[in-house]
Structure formats: C-alpha cells, structure tokens
C-alpha cells in the first residue's frame, strides 16, 4: 500500500474532528477566545441546537484588521510564540486550531475591530475557503457567526444528538464558563428565548444563584485554603442537593473548566463522611496553581490536565473540603451554654475515683467505651495465643460469646473521670450536655437540653465513636490485634493483589497481620481487636474494593479512613436495649468526638428539634 499525502482540506477536516466534536465544542472555543480577549460582556445565540447558527458577540480587544485572515490559518495564534510558552500558559486557548477547524466544517463570518482602528474588517469562509474580506462598520470587539455546522461532513452531522440535547450541552458549557468568570456578564439565547443571564460580579455566590437557583445557593458550604503550592476555594453542597450523577460538579484549574479524576476523588472522599452513599455531591472548586506545575497540553480540547505533585494536591483538596464541611456542621450546632460547661470541667472534685480504684468486674452492657484514660482499655485476654473461634477459652467464660464478653466486661467509668480525661486531652464538646429522657424503639436515644430535643441514632453514633478511636490508634500506631486460631486464606484476582501489595504497609498499621501465601493468595493471621468477630474475608475484600475505587494516588491518611469506615461494623446495633447509664455514656463520648454529627457512611447521628419546631407542628404558631 502506497503512502499518500493528504490535501490541506482533508487534513483540516480531520483536525476539526479533534477540536470540533459537536456544537457545544464550537461555543466553548469561541467563548474562550472572547474571554482571552478581555471581554466584559459575552452574548451567545444559537438556533436548532447550534446546527444552523452559533453566534458569539463580545466587547473584547478585537482583532487587528491586518490579522483577520491570519486568524483562520492553522496554528496561528497571538498567545504563544515558542515551545517553552506552552509550559506556562495563562490563556484558555493557545494552539491556534479552533478558528481554522471550525471554518473548515461550516460557513463562518467574522467581524472585528480594535480601538485603534476606525473601521473593522469582515471575513467570510465556507468549508475552509475564503469567500471575501472587506472593511465594515462594527463595534469594538468581535462578532462571529457559524452557520450550517458539518454541512460538508455529512458523516459527522449524522452522529449529532437531538436538537434538545445539543442545546442542553451548550447551556451546560456556558454555565461552567460563567462560573469560572463571574467578572463577565453572559447571556445565552436559544431559538430567540433567553435561557441564561448572569451579571458581572466579584461574588461567586451571586453567579451560582443566577445559574442554579435559590435552593442550591442556600445549601452550599464554602471552603478556602492557600498554600505555597496551590490555592483552593469553592463551594460544596450538603446532602439536601446531592444527586445520583456527577452532572453538577465543576472543576476549574486557573479558571479553565476541566475534568479530573484526582480532584473529583479528593472532594468525594472528603464529603463521604457527611453524606449518604450512592449519591454524588454538588461542588464547584477552583484551583489556582503556577502554570509550570500543571500541564494542560494533554488533550486536544484541553479538558484534561496533569499535575506534578498529585499526592500533595489530593491531600490539600481533601483537607480543605473536609474542614469546610466540619466547620459548617459545628456552626449549625453552636450552643451558648458550652462556655459555662467548659468552666465546670475545671472544677474537679477531690473525691474523683482513680483508675486503680475501679473494679474490673464492674460492667456496662452493650457498649464499648471510648478511651477513658491515656492508656487504652483492653479486653483482658491473652494475645500471645490464638483464640478458638474468637471465644475466650477460660472456664469462666466458656458459655459466653465473644460479643457478650466484649460488651459486658469493659471497665466502668464515672462522669467525673470522663471530665478529667477530656481536660487531659483538651477536647471540647461539640453540643451541650444532654439529659437522657429514654430510648425509642430500642434504636433512638431521646435527650433534652434547654428548649431543644435531641434524637440520637445509637448505631450511627457508636459507629462514629469507634471510627474516630480506631483512626486515632492507627495514627499513633497503637492498634491492638487479635490472633486468629485459623488464618483466613484469601485468593485474590491479579488486579486485587496489586492493590493489596501496594498497600501492605497501610494494612499493617491498621492492625492486620497478613502473609503472602503464593499465587496471588494471602493468609490473614491477625485482625484489629476491636472488630470482635468479623467476617474476615468479606471485610478484607471490601477494603480492597474501597482502595481500588480510590486509585493509587491517594494519601495513606485517606486510605486509613476507608479502612476505618469499613471496619466499624461492631458498633451497637439498632433494636438493642440500652441502660440509662449506657445512653448517658454514649452521648457523652459523642459530644467530644471530632466530627460527631455524621457516621462514617454519611448518615446523621443526631437530629435537633426546637420548641418552635413542635409548636409549628401542633399549629400553635405559623
């Protein structure tokens, strides 16, 4: 087969296939050109989903009349002049491919004038061939019309979606561009009807309200952080506006709209602790980073980027979003009485019982205590030898299950000791001290404070307490393990084994002792003590799946969170009757948790109802 040299017309149409996928691609390229030209107002008009007309008008710098024809030549650009420039790009466009690609598959007319010229210049191109160039009267800025897109490439036109879907895609990209550039006024008209209007503002929340409406605006949480590497800011939605898809997620790098799995994973992992599973959060995130640390020259449409410091970027985003949500939850549970309670904590009575005075046969049913002293409370079993079927093998506990043993033989602590320990650890209560009223349906604890009723999900609350305890133990490398009498042998798929092998140290620090058994098979010999009697194989595979979904770039801290989340299944269950003291202790532990308001899986742990809420329900007030 002989090698042929393609004609300029053919090569331009092939190149157009990379840049001009659909009508929304044309809108994106033209609007980005307007933004690069310093426009303050951009008007877009489309007809029939952009098939028959795409019109973009701006009030930017305009194109010099002597450069009008050059603008439609391949690789002609005003934004870079040498190869090194692509590594420090500050503009949205730079390759000089958009206009020639668009003009090669449509009928295009462009008018433009700069402030230095009294008259503008107009050029018309059909299918890549120049029809005419002439002087014209026009305002400062650029006015471009693209008609009959793909008229000369029927194969491409055939694969366009319905008019409504193409119009929706255009609306979506204009929304993203408006979010990225709230300092610019945007207007989109579809078949003569105005569908998007934003006004120039220095307040992003105003643009969010204009695009998404009041409900979205009222349910977003702001976050912001500045580091030497990157500045991060934006908004993330609460559970009220989470969706079943990622359509309402927007990522901007130096104001360029992109899609990036690393950033998406960082935000979603940060939100995961506060939101129900099977939902995706609404978020708008901006990253400002030095151009030399990010490569946008990865994809023809510049929709993907690569970072030099992926792990650092992930951690900064994760921490920033997580802290923003946590602070918002704290604000919603702000209590005036906390200061008074803090003062009471330091009024320690002399008759506080010491650790040595507590009898080990004191019992608390159904609930694992959080650390009551600097030394972790341990179940009194011999870790030097295996545990037959996880049961204590002594005669005294012969007829008792491990779960009963774990739940009933934990050291009892007094409220005075709890206060002393909180002083030692310098932990602050996140909600007021509550008076326990009782238990509803053996699942929810009812408690009150002042004129407020608190409803606590006992399982979700205990999960969060265990989660934070386990995570802290991992951080301090203080996880206690229990030996399995019969190691659990797990045969992994090759892909799963790769993820295990990559994270061996993570498993080790989390309290798992695992040995290689040959041929992608491992033997799990020890598991974290607090798990009780877990289904070892199922838990291990669940953790592997979580790590796979996270990818390989995430930090160990995030991986430990994932393991802790999967491991917290030993929490007290729903429909389990608790004593009054157990309920008090659970609430007290939850008060001093770092993030007490959501379980590790995102469900709320506590709901607050005020007297006003009840009076509205009973129609006492409107």
Curated annotation (Swiss-Prot):
One GO process term, biological-process aspect: mismatch repair
Transmembrane as UniProt keyword: no
PROSITE patterns associated with the record: DNA_MISMATCH_REPAIR_1
Keyword DNA repair appears in the UniProt entry: yes
Annotated GO MF terms: ATP binding; ATP hydrolysis activity; ATP-dependent DNA damage sensor activity; mismatched DNA binding
Keywords: DNA damage, DNA repair
GO cellular component, one term: mismatch repair complex
InterPro entries the record matches: DNA_mismatch_repair_CS, DNA_mismatch_repair_MutL, DNA_mismatch_S5_2-like, HATPase_C_sf, MutL/Mlh/PMS, MutL/Mlh/Pms-like, MutL_C, MutL_C_dimsub
Protein's job: This protein is involved in the repair of mismatches in DNA. It is required for dam-dependent methyl-directed DNA mismatch repair. May act as a 'molecular matchmaker', a protein that promotes the formation of a stable complex between two or more DNA-binding proteins in an ATP-dependent manner without itself being part of a final effector complex.
Family: Belongs to the DNA mismatch repair MutL/HexB family.
Protein name in UniProt: DNA mismatch repair protein MutL
């Amino acid at each position: 087969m002989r090698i042929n040299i393609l004609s300029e017309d053919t090569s331009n149409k092939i190149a157009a296939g990379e840049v001009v996928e659909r009508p929304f691609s044309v809108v994106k390229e033209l609007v980005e050109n307007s933004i690069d030209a310093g426009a303050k107002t951009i008007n877009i008009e489309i007809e029939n989903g952009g098939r028959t007309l795409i019109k973009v008008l701006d009030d930017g710098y305009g194109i010099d009349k002597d450069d009008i024809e050059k603008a439609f030549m391949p690789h002609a650009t005003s934004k870079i002049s040498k190869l090194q420039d692509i590594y420090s790009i500050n503009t949205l466009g730079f390759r000089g491919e958009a206009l020639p690609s668009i003009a090669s598959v449509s009928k295009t007319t462009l008018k433009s004038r700069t402030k230095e010229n009294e008259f503008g210049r107009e050029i018309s191109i059909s299918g890549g061939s120049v029809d005419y160039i002439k002087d014209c009267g026009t305002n400062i800025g650029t006015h471009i019309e693209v008609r009959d897109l793909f008229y000369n490439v029927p194969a491409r036109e055939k694969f366009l979606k319905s008019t409504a879907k193409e119009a929706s895609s255009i609306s979506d990209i204009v929304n993203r561009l408006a979010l990225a550039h709230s300092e610019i006024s945007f207007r989109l008209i579809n078949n003569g009807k105005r569908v998007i209007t934003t006004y120039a503002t220095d307040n992003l929340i105003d643009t969010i309200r204009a695009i998404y409406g009041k409900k979205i605006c009222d349910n977003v949480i702001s976050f912001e952080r500045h580091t030497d590497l990157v500045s991060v800011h934006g908004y993330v939605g609460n559970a009220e506006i989470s969706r079943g898809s990622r359509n309402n997620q927007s990522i901007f790098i130096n104001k360029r709209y992109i899609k990036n799995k690393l950033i998406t994973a960082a935000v979603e992992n940060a939100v995961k602790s506060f939101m129900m599973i099977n939902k995706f959060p609404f978020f708008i995130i901006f990253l400002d980073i030095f151009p030399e640390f990010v490569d946008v020259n990865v994809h023809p449409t510049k929709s993907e980027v690569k970072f030099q410091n992926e792990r650092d970027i992930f951690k900064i985003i994760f921490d920033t979003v997580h802290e923003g949500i946590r602070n918002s939850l704290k604000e919603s549970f702000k209590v005036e009485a906390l200061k008074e309670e803090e003062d009471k904590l330091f009024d320690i009575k002399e008759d506080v019982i010491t650790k040595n005075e507590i009898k080990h046969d004191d019992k608390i049913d159904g609930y694992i205590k959080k650390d009551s002293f600097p030394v972790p409370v341990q179940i009194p079993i011999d870790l030097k030898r295996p545990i037959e079927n996880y049961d204590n093998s002594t005669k005294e506990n012969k007829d008792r299950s491990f779960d009963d043993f774990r739940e009933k033989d934990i050291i009892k602590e007094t409220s005075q000791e709890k206060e002393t320990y909180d002083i030692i650890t310098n932990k602050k209560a996140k909600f007021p001290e509550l008076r326990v009223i009782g238990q509803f349906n053996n699942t929810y604890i009812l408690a009150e404070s002042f004129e407020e009723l608190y409803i606590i999900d006992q399982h979700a609350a205990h999960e969060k307490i265990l989660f934070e305890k386990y995570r802290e133990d991992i951080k301090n490398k203080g996880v206690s393990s229990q030996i399995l009498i019969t190691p659990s042998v797990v045969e992994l798929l090759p892909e799963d084994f790769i993820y295990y092998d990559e994270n061996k140290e993570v498993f080790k620090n989390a309290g798992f002792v695992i040995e290689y058994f040959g041929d992608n098979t491992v033997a799990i010999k020890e598991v974290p003590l607090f798990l009780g009697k877990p289904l070892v194989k199922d838990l291990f595979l669940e953790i592997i799946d979580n790590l796979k979904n996270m990818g390989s770039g995430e930090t160990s801290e995030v991986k430990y969170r994932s393991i802790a989340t999967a491991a917290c299944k030993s929490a007290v269950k729903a429909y389990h009757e608790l004593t009054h003291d157990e309920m008090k202790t659970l609430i007290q532990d939850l008060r001093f948790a770092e993030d007490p308001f959501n379980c590790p899986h995102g469900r709320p742990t506590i709901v607050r109802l005020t007297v006003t809420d009840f009076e509205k329900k009973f129609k006492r007030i409107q």
